[in-house]
Every structure is written in C-alpha cells, then in structure tokens.
Amino acid sequence: MRVSIVLPVADWRACGPAAAAAEAAGFDAVQANEIAHEPFTPLAFAALATERVELVTSVAIAFPRSPMIVANHTWDLARHSKGRFVLGLGTQVRAHNERRFSTPWTAPAARMAEYVQALRAIFRCWETGERLEFAGEHYRFNLMNKEFSPGPNHLKLPAITIAAVGPLMLRNAARYCDGVRLHSFATRAYIEQQVAPMLDRHLAEVGRPRSTFEVSGGGFVATGGTAEEVRQAADKVRYRIAWYASTPAYRTVLQPHGLEALGEKLSVLARQGRFEGIEALIPDEVLELFAAIGPYDRIAERIADRFGGLADTVTIPFPEGADPGAVRQVVRDVQAIPAAYAGHG
C-alpha cells in the first residue's frame, strides 16, 4: 500500500522542506489540497526540493478553470518534476461552483468526462505534434500555434485522477482516468458493497486490469505517538464525520449502517448554523466505521483492517513535531500491506 501526506499549502516556504522530509521518511506521494488555497504553486516548490515522491493535487477544482489552463499547470509541473506530477481533479458541488466561483453548473459527470478527454487531446498535441481538434458539448479546442505550445516533455503523458462519489463519476474514473480519489466520508461496507463492484465492472468493460488503476482514500486515519495525540487526532476526524454527515448528498453512505436518523439530526443543526460541538454526536462505534485509529505501533494493522483489499493509497496525517524515526517506521509498516495497484510509471 502507498502512503501520502498533505503539504502545508498556506506556507509556500514550508512546502519544499515538508516535501523533502516526506521523501526522506519514505512517503510515496505528497499532496496539495484546494480548500482556501490553490494547489499548483505549493507543488512547484515541492518539485524543486525532491527527486522521487509523486506530487498530487487532491483535488484541483476543475470547472472554474479552462482545461487549457489546467493543462499548462500540469505540463510545467510534469516537466520540472521529471514526470512525477499527478493531476487530481474534482467538481465541487453546485453551490460552490455557482456562488463561490461564479461558474455555470451543468451535469457534472458528463462535463468531467469531456474535461478529461480534452486534457488528453491537449497533452497529445504538445507531446507529439498531433493537430489539436477537440469538440464537445462543453469544450472546443482547435487552435494551437507553435508559439503557444510548450513543446514535448519527452515523458509519459501526465496521469489524471478524479474524485468520485456517485456511479456516473465512478464510471468516468474507470473509463477515462488513471485512478479515483474516494471521499474520506466512506465506510468499508459502503466501498465493498457499492463502490468497488462498480469500479470493477467499468474497468472490465474497457479491458483495464485493476493493477493499472489507483484507488486512493475512502476513509480517515488518526494516529499519534501517545494516547493523547491519538485522541486529539480522532476528535478532528469525529468533527469531519459530523460535518459531512450533515450534508444530504452524503446520506447514501449512512444508509448501509442504519444511520439516516443521525444524518437528519445533523442536517437540522447545520441549517441552524450550529456546528460547534457537533462532534459530540458521533459515538466511537460510528467513528470507527469511517476511520483507522491507533498509535504508531498499531496503526498499520488498523489501516489493513479498514482499507486492505480496497484502497491502494492512504493519506496519513501525523501530529506536529512527530518523531521522524517513528514516522518512517509507520510508513514502512503500511507499505507492507498488499495492494492491487502497480504504479503510474
């Protein structure tokens, strides 16, 4: 199993050292999230400070950006990292597209499928000189003069993964992408019963072996070197579970466990703006459905129980100031867990 860690994207000066430390600790990838900050620039600093780790956006919000703009970011990061950049894309929800980004909303699965195919066409144009001619319902690209082409990277074309929750986006991932980024708000039962069968079916439809397709995430990890650190990490996860459970769009994740009433109660509090203290509504038995929790010397075992056979890559947050030797050992222990995916190379 592969192990990733999130970069401190709010502090560009810290991104290079953090990525170098992750590489020294044996991590397979570092990732930059797009929440309050854009994810591409932090990875540029990480690229210049490392030689081995993958550099991943997890995820960049797609629709407010033209595929051409994203292609430029991707191409440059791939070039300067010598092929280590992985583009992770997500749609965000309608309200954020329309009200935060002022971006028109259309059927997201169909649009994302077209978005990824447009990116592939742009990549082929730049790498091989193939004429740029892409025409879809949402995007059209047919102008690429030599002056505006960055030219070939002489590398494998950049890998693309997408975030997916529903069946249409999961189908997109299997058909058009190099991997899928599952939502952290997921349980093992939900992935086993609903997500994995869909992915397997759609991969089979296009004749893709599972070893060529990366499944990332699908739950939380909470760990630490002391009982107090584990408790603090678990409480952060508890809050995130409550926050996501308050969103009706994620109610299907609660259904296999008979937790719809909990979701409805949290939705009422969310509509009232009462988020403070909502983590208290998440009992330990619900917390453990969504997360692998334990101290350093047990966390690999918990991750194997929670993610084994389903996920290829997990993201592990460590407490601030964690002992580097302990972190290296956890990474090695998790990497010993079998996984299906063989790598983007």
Regions found by a protein language model. Name each.
Residues 1-345:
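Active-site-adjacent structural elements that line small-molecule/cofactor binding pockets in enzymes
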